[in-house]
Structures are given as C-alpha cells and as structure tokens.
C-alpha cells in the first residue's frame, strides 16, 4: 500500500505513477481476441482513442441465428480496503460489482453474484479465523441490503506458502441477462 504522509506533491505523484496498479492493462488484454464469434457487445476498451476500460464484459448469447439477448459480468474488489477492513472490503466488493453491472445497462433485480475468496492458512490463531468470517458477513450484509443472492463461490483457504500469506481477498462477480440495445 502506498505511503503518502510527509511527502511533497511531486513525490506523491512519482510514487503513484510508479505503482503497477495505475498502469495500463491494455497490452495484457490484447493477448485475448474479443472478436471471435462476433458476439462481443462491448469491446474491452472504448472511447475516442480506445483506451478506456469497460465496466463489464458484455456478449450476446451463442445461439443459432441472430439474438439481442446478452450476458453481462462485472467484478468488484479493492485490495487496500480489503486488507484494512475485511467486512467493509467484502461489502464494497459486492456493491461495486453490482454498480458496474447496472452502469452497463443491466437491471440489478436480474443480477446474481458469485465470489472468489482467498485467505491465509487459518491454523489455530483466532484473528486469522476472524478475517474470512468478517468478509463473509460483510458480503452477506450487502446481499441482504440489495436483495441479491450469491449463487456460489470458490474459496481458497490455503493461500500460504511457507511463511508467506496472501492478503485477504473476496472478489465479487455480478452477472445478469439483458438486451444488447440497452447496453
């Protein structure tokens, strides 16, 4: 996590542009052909210069003939918030994924969620058990507030290698079916 206290504006800017989290991901995405099958509704990057990443993946359903029915999927996760507060991090992951989906033209009432979780090996330390519990409670709180259920998830509870632990992670994926002309 970047440290900002005691730095000049110039130092803060240099730190920020040196952070891999703010660099362009366009080169990585170009390794995947989004035009295969001619079903893509939203290309990975939009805008006048094709540099703005989309909020969601949207593609028409693969059917015989033509269709306007499409599926959308968006993700939500903030690693800094999740590391600081697992309850709020997971809660906001759910809200962010649904918000991106709605901003892409889908109805939140039609959305479903699925989660991908990674946590350190729990062992016998109570504070380690509290992290995934707090995250799941935060995600549940957001689901209850939105009236949207998670239809499953994949947990990876052994996110440790020797003495290294993965940071607490709960990524929310929101998905829905809609019409391409509404996107």
Regions picked out by a protein language model, each given a short descriptive name:
Residues 1-183:
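Glycine/proline-enriched, intrinsically flexible loops and inter-domain linkers
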């Amino acid at each position: 996590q970047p440290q900002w206290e005691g730095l000049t504006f110039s130092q803060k800017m240099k730190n920020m542009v040196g952070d891999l989290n703010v660099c362009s991901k366009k080169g990585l995405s170009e390794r995947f052909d989004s035009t295969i099958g001619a079903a893509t509704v939203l290309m990975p990057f939009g805008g006048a210069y094709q540099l703005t990443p989309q909020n969601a993946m949207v593609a028409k359903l693969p059917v015989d003939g033509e269709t306007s029915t499409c599926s959308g999927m968006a993700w939500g996760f903030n690693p800094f918030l999740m590391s600081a507060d697992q309850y709020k991090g997971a809660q906001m992951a759910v809200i962010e994924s649904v918000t991106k989906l709605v901003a892409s033209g889908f109805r939140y009432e039609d959305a479903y969620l699925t989660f991908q979780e990674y946590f350190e090996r729990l062992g016998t330390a109570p504070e380690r058990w509290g992290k995934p519990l707090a995250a799941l409670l935060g995600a549940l709180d957001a689901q209850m507030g939105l009236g949207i259920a998670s239809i499953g998830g994949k947990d990876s509870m052994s996110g440790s290698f020797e003495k290294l632990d993965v940071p607490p992670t709960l990524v929310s994926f929101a998905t829905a079916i809609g019409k391409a002309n509404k996107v």
